[in-house]
Amino acid sequence: VLLHTGYTDATLKQNPALWGASIPGITNEASVFLAGLKPMAVGADTWGLGAVPPRPGDKIFYDHVVLLKQHGIYILETMNTGRLADEGVHEFMFVLGQARLKGAVQMIINPVAMW
């Protein structure tokens, strides 16, 4: 599941301080819902998946707890989803090339969408 917000394209160059301080994202409830779909990965075009700051009553970065810790679902951040959104692509083959590192908690990846 990939989410396109347009936030990075609209904010990063014009206001990098704002881009680094806040992001639109999913709620705690949405994290649980998405986990129930049992995807291999959930990602977005923002530097985090959950909203920062979180909505009132939500826990910050709860998406990481639910998706990664509880369900083993990968989280993909700062994905370049603009072209997919611009062309109205909703289904595609997703190919992920990753570096061969052992014990890392973060990874630079080389994702490709084929449609």
Q: Residues of each region from the PLM?
A:
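Active-/binding-site microenvironments in catalytic and ligand-binding cores
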Residues: 2-115
